[in-house]
């Protein structure tokens, strides 16, 4: 089965925690176990940042699902979640905040968003995790790659 692409919705604080760990581990909320079981090595995860409403990074899953409750992500105040369903990962494209891709600029281009009325496009990113189709995956990856600074070796 070909690799799938998922959009992981999270706060700027959770993205910062993932970045601090080198995008080497991705965690899903307690109630996302069923979805976690669908994710496989080789799948891609694209990070959508709440409040800012932008795409910030992508990573590839490099290992199987495991459970770990060691705190990494801050989660919501008063409602802690250990994000216990975890995967080893490696970063593909990681943007600095000024280069994050505003989702608003892709409202008419992403098939996933078209499931909702245009004026309610933000509903497309409610909940922590969703799988997207190949066309959306290509578009987002192209935009992330084009926005990633190239560094000299």
Predicted regions mapped to residue ranges:
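Short beta-strand-centered aromatic/proline hotspots
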Residues: 55-64
